[in-house]
Structure formats: C-alpha cells, structure tokens
Amino acid sequence: MRKLSAATILVSLCAHLTPVAATRIPAVAPHVNDPQRPLLETARTATFRNSSEALQDVLDALEAMQETYFDKFAGTWGDAIDWTAAVAGTHVSATLTGIVDGLDLSFGGVCSDLLQWENVVNQYYTQTAFFYFGENVFALRNQAFDDMLWVVLGWLESTKFADMYARRHENGQEFETSPWHGLQLSPMAAHRARVFYELASVGWDESLCNGGMTWNPSLNPYKNAITNELFAAASISMYLYFPGDNNSAPFISSTQEQYHKVHNPAHLENAVKSYKWLKESGMRNQAGLYQDGFHVTGWHRFPNGTINPGTGHCDDLDRMVYTYNQGVMLTASRGLWLATGARSYLDDGHELITNVIRATGWPNTDNIWRGLGRGGTLEEFCDHGLYCSQDGQTFKGIFFLHLTEFCRPLRASEKDMAFRLVVGGLDDQIYHYHLERCAAYSKWIYHNADAALATKNQAGLFGMWWNVPYQTAHIAEWESLAGNQSLPAGVFDHRNPALISSSLISSGDPNDRGRGRTVETQSGALAVLRAKWQWQAVYS
Ligand SMILES: *[C@@H]1O[C@H](CO)[C@@H](O)[C@H](O)[C@H]1NC(C)=O
Ligand SMILES: *[C@@H]1O[C@H](CO)[C@@H](O)[C@H](O)[C@H]1NC(C)=O
Ligand SMILES: *[C@@H]1O[C@H](CO)[C@@H](O)[C@H](O)[C@H]1NC(C)=O
Ligand SMILES: *[C@@H]1O[C@H](CO)[C@@H](O)[C@H](O)[C@H]1NC(C)=O
C-alpha cells in the first residue's frame, strides 16, 4: 500500500478542489473577529453572503463560548454542572457538523482557505477530545437516567461529526493511507455512549404506568417527558449512528453483549416502545405541548424496604411546560422516520413544532405571554422573572439543537443507510414534503436568532431572556413585566425554584441579573444562530 504524507494529501485535496467555475472560494480570515476581514468573501449570490453573515455569528458565538468558559486544563466548562457540560459538548460537535455541512466547497477552493477552515475545525474538535477526559464520568454514572442519556447523545454527536468530516475531507477520493486523524476519538466516544446507554437502559420500568423510563433511580418514581424523550432519541441514534464498540470494559455479559452491534434491532425496539409510551401517556396539554411528567399517587417506600405501589398508575401530572421538553422528541421523530420510513413520525414532529411556534404568539409580536414565549420569541417561564436556574438556562438551546437536527437534510451516507434499513429506501415524496414544511419555519427561526443576537454584550456573550435587547431603552417596561406573571394554580416550576427577589430586579442589563450570562445561555444562542445558518444555507 502506498503511503502518502499529510502534505501530499493536502496538495491532492487542494488540486481536486481547484476552481471549476470562475467563482472565488470563501476566504477565511485568520481571526474570526477581525471586522476588517470578513470571514467569507464570495462572488456568489446575496443569499450566500447573507448566510455567511449567519455563519460568522455562529463562529463568533462559539469562539466566545470556548474562550470565556472552556477550561482547557480541566477539559471542561468550569462553571457547568455535569449534565449542562454534556449538553455544551453536544453543541460544539453539532456546530462543527453544521459548519462543515453548510459549506459549499464544490464550486472551487483555494488551498490556503481550506487549510484555515481545517484549522478552525480542528481547534474545536480538539477541545471536544479534551472534554472526553475532562467529563465527570464517575459522578455521572451514579446520577439520574436523564443525565446519563445526555452523555450518550453528546458522544454520538461527536462520532457523527467525525464520520461526516472524514468523508467530506476525502471528498470522494480514496486515499490509500490512514483516514482523517479525528477518527481516533470515535472508538472512545462510541464506547462511552454505549456504556452510558446500558447504564440508563435499566430505567425502563413496566411495573408502574405500563412502562416508561423513571427519571431518577434514587427518588420516588417520576416518569417524566425528558427522560423518555431522551431514551427514545438516544435509542434511535444508537440504532442509526453507533459505530460499534469492541471494548468490553467495564463488564460484559450475555445481555449487554447485544448492545455492542451496529444497527442493533434492540435499540430500534427501545426507541419504538419509549416513543409510543410517551405519545400515549397523556402528558401533553391542550396546546399540544409536553408537560413535565407523572408521579404515581400513593407510591411509598417504607423504611423496612417494603413498597406500597399506590395506584400504580401515572395519574399525578406535573403540568409545568419547559422548552426542552418540546425539543428532544424531534430527534426521536426524525430518527424513527429514517429507520422505518414511516411518515407519521415526521408528522408528529411538525405538529409539535407548530404548537411551539404558536405558543410564542407568532406571527403576533406583542408582549403577552402565550405559554412558551411572547413576541414570537421562545421563552422559558423563568426568563421574565430573571430567576432561571442553571437547568433552566440550558433549555432553549436544547430545543433549537433538536429542531435543527430534525430539519437537517439527509447526507448521501444517510440516504444509503436508509436504503439498507428500510425496504425500498425512503419515499422521496415524503422527504420533499418534510423539507417543504421545514422551510416554512424560516421566518420564525430568523426572528428568534435575531432576538438572541440583540442580547449580545460587548464581550460577545449572550443572555438568557431573548426578548430583552442588550442595554434596552425600555428598561422600566421590562421591569414591570418581570414581576407581572404567575403560573396557573397548582403548577410549580420545580426546575427553577427561586422566587423573584428584589436583589434580582436590581440594576444593569436584565440579562446580567440572576445567574446572568453563562456557558448555558451562550450555548442557547449558539444553537439558535446555528439554526439560522442552516435555514439560510439550505432553505433560502
Ligand atoms: C440579506 O441581507 C440584506 C442586507 O443585510 C437584507 O436586506 C436582506 O433582506 C437579506 N436577505 C435575506 C434573505 O435574509
Ligand atoms: C470490531 O472488531 C471487528 C473484528 O475485528 C472489526 O471488523 C470491527 O471493525 C471492529 N469494530 C470497531 C468499531 O472497531
Ligand atoms: C414494612 O413496614 C410496613 C409499614 O410499617 C408494614 O406494613 C410492612 O408489613 C413491613 N414489611 C415487612 C416485610 O416487615
Ligand atoms: C401587568 O398586569 C396587569 C394586570 O394583568 C396589566 O394590566 C398590565 O398591563 C401588565 N403590565 C405589563 C407590562 O404587561
């Protein structure tokens, strides 16, 4: 086998990409923040120029997130908690995918530009590798089932990116040499995803409520939306994207062995059953939004260990509505369609998205709370009170991450995969119908991205309450709004338990109050800006 040096590969890669048309490639500025040198300069259409502005916003948000919050020595975001760090890592991997996916290199390239892109990608990819070692895995192994499943989704996102980038990097050429170096991380990422998937799978319980995942092994049974959505999303993502794992540590048994395979039917089965259970659980409200979850009336564990199962049914509903509970299900819907070809999964997703958009008031942009936002912009209920917890600050970004995945066009490798998994392959008409529905969300997405952008401060950091522009002139109006809203009787925001205190409603920009700007709020902006980049690059 002929071995090629890295330099030879790059030269041949560049040669392959020498301009076919007279158009010049996007040039990459060495410093993405240098206003004198826009990131992309192109002779292409206005649409492309516009989407390159969106890409610039994505890169700026990512750079500020990593420079401000990521601690390279520790390999993690120092102020994050374990699950929000797992989500931050997912955003970084998904953003890399979005950047590379959206770049149209096919119209010709200049080698130095490509080398600079390579450097941008490698910089952040290396940081995800640092995080592999910085992630608090020993603690996470004993946390709630949803915590474990965020870990699964994060490392699958990393292997998805590596697979895509390795293919893209080769650009159709078959190099008789070692593949893209980043693939070295994938077996480790796959191993971690597999181990945490197995740890979480024991949360499935049929002794109560005829099924469903339990949220937390050490608390009274609570079957909530997020854990079930995560189990459905993680199961179908394992089925589709898990590249296999030959590392049997930390244990191997006959039951666990089944989970090591690629396209494992056990993963598909878990996805179908948890998706179905959740859909039929009665967890949605009249607006069609997922509420938080079910307790079992009367369930009790006596000190001697005896359990009184109470009614044994999911009959005590926590009616709080959060943005992230409308998001993760979308990845499950998309994956189940890809794995089965069944249109109903896509319809479920579009219905949920439509309900969310309606619950922001859109296209109405007045100041009245509509259930999940106001002014056409997504909000957490806690946003207006400036008391969102670290959990609450993470939610909107999760929604947009999964919305973007839901509407991400299929790559050629995914179409091939579907052809192998679904008899006859995917129905093109259904796929095009799906893309058309996705395209129709663009205005709402731009509206939300622009609202998030308006919260950006001089350091490039974003706030949590997207409806309040940075240094707003209308501060008195916002302050009155902040104390002006209450939850329906009997609903308690247990994820953001702080009461509005006068110390939160002090001075300064509203988005600096409460917990202020954090890696979590930054990741939320990153996600919505990336959605804008995807919609502009793909759908306009
Ligand atoms: C593109 O950008 C121009 C100038 O910023 C703006 O007027 C136009 O509406 C944008 N087009 C789209 C499709 O966003
Ligand atoms: C696992 O080992 C088998 C047999 O050696 C090999 O074919 C396969 O590619 C390996 N899978 C992974 C993910 O390394
Ligand atoms: C455990 O305690 C409960 C409540 O005191 C009692 O009803 C039950 O019989 C006890 N079970 C055992 C096995 O002792
Ligand atoms: C606050 O609530 C009162 C009573 O519902 C309403 O009249 C007022 O307009 C609200 N203020 C704002 C800023 O929304």
Range-by-range predicted roles:
Residues 84-87, 140-143, 147-150, 185, ...:
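Structural signature of alpha-solenoid helical repeat junctions
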Residues 59-67, 234, 283-316, 529:
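Extended glycan-interaction surfaces of carbohydrate-active proteins
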Residues 94, 127, 150, 157, ...:
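Alpha-helical scaffold segments in carbohydrate-active enzymes
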Residues 138, 149, 153-281, 286-288, ...:
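Fungal eukaryote-biased detector of long internal structured cores
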Residues 1-26:
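Fungal secretory targeting signals
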Residues 319-320:
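Outer-membrane beta-barrel proteins
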Residues 97-105, 154, 161-168, 203, ...:
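Alpha-solenoid helical repeat scaffolds
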Residues 26-131, 140-146, 182, 203-204, ...:
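CBM-like carbohydrate-recognition segments
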